[in-house]
């Protein structure tokens, strides 16, 4: 359902390699038959993530737009989001009945956040391979995102990470804010993320 303010805009952030593109792919495949959806990816000097989504068949090519941010990727989603706002406007022009735009940030540090002008809902992805201590390091993405995804749980035995410790730290850092433990390459946890986006974003109402 497209609101009078345009499509629901969901920002997906997280460090390099945490699984943002995998989450984009999983959400696109779950939503594409039910909603009018587009995807916008941010890379510093390439459009690699857009290419990955296209090759994976997540959406038709014309519904995926790659943005080259240059410089610091967090600037393009917060301090000066104009390039991404223009991308959202372009997709809305192409598809007037657009319900949902997924916006993947370029990989950045734990302090990166989306401007509320750009994203209605923010999802933040961290991964177990980054170390058991990641949740307790905090940062706006971990503590204030609308939903935190702790990805690559399947790698915990290989990197010596205790998932129960990570969950305890996640609960402590986030308070009542929701989180999901996931293995997005296999699709584990993706349904829970999709449900959250639908419920929090009022899709289908």
UniProtKB/Swiss-Prot annotation:
One of the GO BP terms on file: urea catabolic process
Localization per Swiss-Prot or TrEMBL: Cytoplasm
Any one GO molecular-function label of the UniProt entry: GTP binding
Binding site for GTP: 14-21
Domain of life: Bacteria
Main location: cytoplasm
GO cellular component terms, A-Z: cytoplasm
UniProt xrefs under Pfam families: cobW
Keywords: Chaperone, Cytoplasm, GTP-binding, Nickel insertion, Nucleotide-binding
InterPro entries: CobW/HypB/UreG_nucleotide-bd (IPR003495), P-loop_NTPase (IPR027417), UreG (IPR004400)
Subunit structure: Homodimer. UreD, UreF and UreG form a complex that acts as a GTP-hydrolysis-dependent molecular chaperone, activating the urease apoprotein by helping to assemble the nickel containing metallocenter of UreC. The UreE protein probably delivers the nickel.
Family: Belongs to the SIMIBI class G3E GTPase family. UreG subfamily.
PANTHER family registered for this protein in UniProt: UREASE ACCESSORY PROTEIN G
Protein role: Facilitates the functional incorporation of the urease nickel metallocenter. This process requires GTP hydrolysis, probably effectuated by UreG.
Name this protein carries in UniProt: Urease accessory protein UreG 1
């Amino acid at each position: 359902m497209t609101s009078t303010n345009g499509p629901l805009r969901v920002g997906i952030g997280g460090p390099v390699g945490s699984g943002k593109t995998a989450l984009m792919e999983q959400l696109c495949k779950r939503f594409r038959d039910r909603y009018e959806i587009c995807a916008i990816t941010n890379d510093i000097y390439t459009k690699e993530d857009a290419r990955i989504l296209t090759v994976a068949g997540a959406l038709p090519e014309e519904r995926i737009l790659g943005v080259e941010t240059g410089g610091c990727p967090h600037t393009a989603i917060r301090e000066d989001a104009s390039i991404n706002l223009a991308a959202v406007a372009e997709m809305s022009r192409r598809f007037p009945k657009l319900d949902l735009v997924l916006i993947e940030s370029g990989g950045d540090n734990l302090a990166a956040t989306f401007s509320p002008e750009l994203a209605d809902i923010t999802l933040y992805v961290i991964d177990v391979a980054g170390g058991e201590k990641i949740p307790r390091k905090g940062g706006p993405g971990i503590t204030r995102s609308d939903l935190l995804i702790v990805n690559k749980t399947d790698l915990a035995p290989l990197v010596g990470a205790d998932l129960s410790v990570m969950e305890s730290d996640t609960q402590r850092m986030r308070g009542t804010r929701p989180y999901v433990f996931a293995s997005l390459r296999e699709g584990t946890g993706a349904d829970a993320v999709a449900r959250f986006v639908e419920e929090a974003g009022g899709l289908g109402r």
